């Protein structure tokens, strides 16, 4: 029982730190001091170190000799690489989902998330709706390895979406998301892929400008 409890504690610490990083509550480049986290969270250093190690595996945290663990920083090259990989995975998921998945279920789920996006009361709610909308294709693609590949980059992609949500006009890509819905309705995977690419490419300039202003 103690082992399960410990694992649960690590999960809780990991989830909290991850959420704080991807929502920018912990700024990029910030140092993660284990002793400070120990005092803040009221736990021993062991589960904190295990949680930080998991964040390192996601590359949300970087470890440097003589410095320790710190939150990642991003530049234009990083943004391009993350977007390229994420888009490749998203488009693969779309094509597989529309070939193997349940079209009616996909359309219903996407319309639900589109409605949540349109009625989001905060940028954070909008980010969650976009994340869930794209996640529909992974859930329906029928390829667990593709799903796991997405998870490996999910944290960094969510960080970029939260940065974009800090920018003016973050909600201005509703036509792209509507085009995703229409592509599913018309059984046109290439239209869906094009809409997702347009959404991602449209967000990049604002993200890069934000990074430049927060150097």
What are these regions (language model features)?
Residues 57, 91, 95-98, 119, ...:
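Regular, well-ordered alpha-helical segments
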Residues 57-62, 153, 169-170:
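Mobile beta-alpha loop/short-helix "lid" or hinge segments that flank ligand
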Residues 201-210:
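Short arginine-rich
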Residues 1-99, 209-215:
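Short linear motifs at protein or domain termini
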Residues 98-99, 142, 166-167:
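Short helix-capping/hinge motifs at transmembrane helix termini and TM-loop junctions
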């Amino acid at each position: 029982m103690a082992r399960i409890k410990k694992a649960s504690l690590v999960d809780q610490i990991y989830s909290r730190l991850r959420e704080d990083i991807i929502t920018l509550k912990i700024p990029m480049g910030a140092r993660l001091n284990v002793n400070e986290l120990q005092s803040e969270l009221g736990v021993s250093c062991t589960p904190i170190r295990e949680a930080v190690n998991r964040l390192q595996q996601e590359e949300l945290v970087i470890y440097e000799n003589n410095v320790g663990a710190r939150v990642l920083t991003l530049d234009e090259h990083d943004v391009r690489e993350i977007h390229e990989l994420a888009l490749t995975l998203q488009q693969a998921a779309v094509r597989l989902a529309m070939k193997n998945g349940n079209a009616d279920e996909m359309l219903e789920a996407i319309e639900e998330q589109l409605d949540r996006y349109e009625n989001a009361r905060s940028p954070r709610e909008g980010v969650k709706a976009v994340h869930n909308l794209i996640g529909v294709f992974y859930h329906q693609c029928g390829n667990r390895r593709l799903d796991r590949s997405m998870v490996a980059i999910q944290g960094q992609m969510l960080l970029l979406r939260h940065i974009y949500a800090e920018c003016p006009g973050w909600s201005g890509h509703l036509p792209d998301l509507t085009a995703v819905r229409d592509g599913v309705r018309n059984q046109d995977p290439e239209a869906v892929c094009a809409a997702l690419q347009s959404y991602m490419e449209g967000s990049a300039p604002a993200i890069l400008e934000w990074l430049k202003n927060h150097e």
